Structures are given as C-alpha cells and as structure tokens.
C-alpha cells in the first residue's frame, strides 16, 4: 500500500486531476441481468420494498435481446403471474399481446405498431415503457412473488419479481381470487409455468366484445326546433301510394316488343322543350346578347371619328395639301430645264 501511495504522489498534478474527473464522470452501471433463452431482463433489483408513503408499487427494468441478433419484425406476448405458495397455484393478473414490432437496438417490444391488453387486474406491466410491475395504492395482500412470462420467437422465459408491502399505515384492500382462477402447479414451478395451457391462450384469441351503437334520432327540419312526430304504418303506405299514382309510367310494351310512350310523358317533354325555346327567345335574353354588341360597335365608331378629326386638323393648320406641294415641284419626264435669264446664276444640277 505504501508503494502504491508513493507512486500516486509522484504523478503530475494535471494527470491526477484528469483521472479523478474521468472517474467522477464515468456512469456507474448497477443492477442485475437475468439471461433467458429468447430475451433477457435488466433490473435494478428483482425485489422491492414499498415505503409507507409510496402511492404506487413499481419495478422498472428493460427487456433485451442478447442471445444472437435481434429480429427485425416479430410479435410476442407478455403475462404477469402471481404465485400462491400456500395453495401451490398461480393467478394470471395481466396479459398483453404485441404485434408488428421493429428492431430498436437490442430492446424488446419497443415501437410496436399494435398492442392489445385482453386481461388487466390490480397488477399490470408496460414493458415498452420499461415497467415490469405496477400496482396502484398497494396493500399488504399485494405483496408476494410475481413471474413475468415472456413469449417471443417460439421461446418462453420466466423472470421472478418480489414485492414487499409493510402493513403499517396502509388500508387493507383484499385481493379477490377464487379457487377456480388459481391454476394448480404440477411438478416444479419452473416447468409448470413454462408450459402454457391452451385454455390460457383463449384470452388472446377471443375477440373483444362489440359495444352497441347508441340509437340515432332523425334530425328536426331546419328552421324549427320541434322534433318530427312519428307516423303510423298506414300513413306511410298512403304516402307511398300517392307518390306512385303521381309518377307517370314512361310507356308500355306492345305485342311486338316495341315501347309505346305514354301520352302524358310525351306532352310533358314537348312542353318542356317549348318553354326552353321560349325562354331563350325572350326579350331579356335578346337584351343580354345585343347589349355588349352595341357597346363594342359604338366604341369602334368613336375611334373612327376621332381619327378623321385628327386628319382634318392637320390639313387646316398647313393651309394646303402637303401632297400637292410635292407634286408641283416635280418636273415631267422629257421636259427641258428653264433657260436662265441674264444676270441670274444657272441652277446647279442636283
């Protein structure tokens, strides 16, 4: 010990401080790891003592895939069994079924798309939230040993959890469990709990009861707050007969199989066509068509008149036609240039 202390004192102060800081920042790994054939469980402790002021009994832990690679898509079932050593039987307190579970690192039942809980009593579990055992307002009868049975990939694993609940300061809530619900143990506890009775799996295959839909009442007509009165069967039959009588038959088939139209139907069709034609030729429709046409025509005539006025103003300002001045300066073809008079310079040819 003296040699070790002497060697430590010889280390540089900076290196010693760095080693102490690294040791302080290193997370302390604690807990117990129980290995199984399909999954393993890591818990801080398989037994828990519930304090007198604790409102809930909770044992947290994580289910892990440690034996081989974790499956990419799997399903499984998780059950919570309560042991009764005095009567050598067990009671199933909780059952859950997980389906369509993806691979999330090495944790089991994380991110499953479907979960169903066909059975839930006082004790429950939520392994996807890292909760292996949960009891709300625990009482002394809730103390004892529980077994978490996990079935996945054709394997069954058992993990024992123990809860201790002191009686002082707690109300007594008796846990009802009849002798029929407590299944007897044949042989050892391990072998009996590992073999699943087909009757126990019936809870997973039985569909949940369908809740009856609430009766619907017809909505009252808009604008009134009164509820429509129920009508008798005779009134409904009379209304149906009146509707049938008012609806004309389109036609009948003759002996040759040709459709003969009913006169009332033909007259109604002709009357509808006449009304449509008359409506199209009414004064309102004609005004709607001719109105925009007249407006466009007036705009066009106004533009033509404006252009004519501009041309007239240009001619009046010059006093003569510009085209006539250009025409007068031109010399006809074949004409001789004018003879210059004495004393005037002759025009130079252009």
From Swiss-Prot:
It is a single-pass membrane protein; Single-pass type I membrane protein. InterPro entries: Herpes_gI (IPR002874). The keyword rRNA-binding does not apply. Residues 232-241 have a biased composition (Acidic residues). The chain crosses the membrane at residues 286-308. The keyword Glycoprotein applies. It is found in: Virion membrane; Host cell membrane; Host cell junction; Host Golgi apparatus membrane. In epithelial cells, the heterodimer gE/gI is required for the cell-to-cell spread of the virus, by sorting nascent virions to cell junctions. Once the virus reaches the cell junctions, virus particles can spread to adjacent cells extremely rapidly through interactions with cellular receptors that accumulate at these junctions. Implicated in basolateral spread in polarized cells. In neuronal cells, gE/gI is essential for the anterograde spread of the infection throughout the host nervous system. Belongs to the alphaherpesvirinae glycoprotein I family. This is Envelope glycoprotein I. It comes from Suid herpesvirus 1 (strain Rice). The lineage of its organism: Viruses, Duplodnaviria, Heunggongvirae, Peploviricota, Herviviricetes. The gene is gI.
């Amino acid at each position: 010990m003296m040699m070790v202390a002497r060697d430590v004192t010889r280390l540089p102060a900076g290196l010693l401080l760095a080693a102490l800081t690294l040791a302080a920042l290193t997370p302390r790994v604690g807990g117990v790891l129980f290995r199984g054939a399909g999954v393993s469980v890591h818990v801080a402790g398989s037994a828990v003592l519930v304090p007198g002021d604790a409102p809930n009994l909770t044992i947290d832990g994580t289910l892990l895939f440690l034996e081989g690679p974790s499956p990419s898509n799997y399903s499984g079932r998780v059950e919570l069994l309560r042991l009764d050593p005095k009567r050598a039987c067990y009671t199933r307190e909780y059952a859950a079924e997980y389906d369509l579970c993806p691979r999330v690192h090495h944790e089991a039942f994380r991110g499953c798309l479907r979960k169903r809980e066909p059975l839930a009593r006082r004790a429950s579990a939520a392994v996807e939230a890292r909760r292996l055992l949960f009891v709300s307002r625990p009482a002394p009868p809730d103390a004892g040993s529980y077994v978490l049975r996990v079935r996945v990939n054709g394997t069954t694993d058992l993990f024992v959890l123990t809860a201790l609940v002191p009686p002082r300061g707690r109300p007594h809530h008796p846990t009802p469990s009849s002798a029929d619900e407590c299944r007897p143990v044949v042989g050892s506890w391990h072998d009996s709990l590992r073999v699943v009775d087909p009757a126990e799996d019936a809870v997973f295959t039985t569909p949940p009861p369908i809740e009856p839909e609430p009766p619907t009442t017809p909505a009252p007509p808009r604008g009134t707050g009164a509820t429509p009165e129920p009508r008798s069967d005779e009134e409904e039959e009379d209304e149906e007969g009146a509707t049938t009588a008012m609806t004309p038959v389109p036609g009948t088939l003759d002996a040759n199989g040709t459709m003969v139209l009913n006169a009332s139907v033909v007259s109604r069709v002709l009357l509808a066509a006449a009304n449509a034609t008359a409506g199209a030729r009414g004064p309102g429709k004609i005004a709607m068509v001719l109105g925009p046409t007249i407006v466009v025509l007036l705009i066009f005539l106004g533009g033509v008149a404006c252009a004519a006025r501009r041309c007239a103003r240009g001619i009046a300002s010059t006093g003569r036609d510009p085209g006539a001045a250009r025409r007068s300066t031109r010399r006809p073809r074949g004409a001789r240039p004018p003879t210059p008079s004495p004393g005037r310079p002759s025009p130079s040819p252009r």
